[in-house]
Amino acid sequence: MDKTTLSVNACNLEYVREKAIVGVQAAKTSTLIFFVIILAISALLLWFQTSDNPVFNELTRYMRIKNTVNDWKSLTDSKTKLESDRGRLLAAGKDDIFEFKCVDFGAYFIAMRLDKKTYLPQAIRRGTGDAWMVKKAAKVDPSAQQFCQYLIKHKSNNVITCGNEMLNELGYSGYFMSPHWCSDFSNME
């Protein structure tokens, strides 16, 4: 044991360096363990990358999909702005276009309107998904029309708007899909 005697105000103090040595040894050991762990993780990652592991192939595919979806965001922003301007032109002098109506798309009815704030097509939503599409049994189907009217009366508080809102909530905007009621509405009027 390495001791040093210090005299302070006529008091002799013995300072033991042994505890300081143990602390230094612990720091050296923990540093060595840390670098060994980092080296092991690096070697494992190198092995994964050079062994053509399917996990990294999936991650690469996921990154490509994520970048593609980010590219869609700018396209959807542009299309949403164009459709909003188009909606403003359609709404000029037509206050009834802001009220829900059953629009006939041939094979189905959708209860829809233009949104008063964004001037984008808006439809009554089915749960947390897309719009209610009331399929018709025949070319003229009064029961489908009646159910569409029921939706307007009782379900009009749950709506989905084409464009950015739909892209954020459902993963698609509705404009670049065919057939879809958002793109079909743009072609109808």
Swiss-Prot record:
Intravirion side: 1-28
Cell location: Virion membrane; Host endoplasmic reticulum membrane
Keywords: Disulfide bond, Fusion of virus membrane with host cell membrane, Fusion of virus membrane with host membrane, Host endoplasmic reticulum, Host membrane, Late protein, Membrane, Signal-anchor, Transmembrane, Transmembrane helix, Viral envelope protein, Viral penetration into host cytoplasm, Virion, Virus entry into host cell
Virion surface side: 50-189
InterPro entries: Pox_LP_H2
Pfam families assigned to the protein according to its UniProt record, in alphabetical order: Pox_LP_H2
Effect after changing G174E: Complete loss of interaction with OPG155
Main location: virion
GO biological process terms on file: fusion of virus membrane with host plasma membrane; symbiont entry into host cell
Recorded topology in the membrane: Single-pass type III membrane protein
Cellular compartments per GO CC: host cell endoplasmic reticulum membrane; membrane; viral envelope; virion membrane
Post-translational modification: Contains two intramolecular disulfide bonds. They are created by the viral disulfide bond formation pathway, a poxvirus-specific pathway that operates on the cytoplasmic side of the MV membranes.
Keyword Disulfide bond annotated: yes
Regions crossing the membrane: 29-49
Keyword check for Transmembrane: yes
Family membership: Belongs to the orthopoxvirus OPG107 family.
Function text: Envelope protein part of the entry-fusion complex responsible for the virus membrane fusion with host cell membrane during virus entry. Also plays a role in cell-cell fusion (syncytium formation).
Subunit and partners: Part of a stable entry-fusion complex (EFC) which is at least composed of proteins OPG143, OPG147, OPG155, OPG86, OPG94, OPG107, OPG104, and OPG099. Formation of the viral membrane is necessary for the assembly of the complex.
Protein known as: Protein OPG107
Organism: Vaccinia virus (strain Western Reserve)
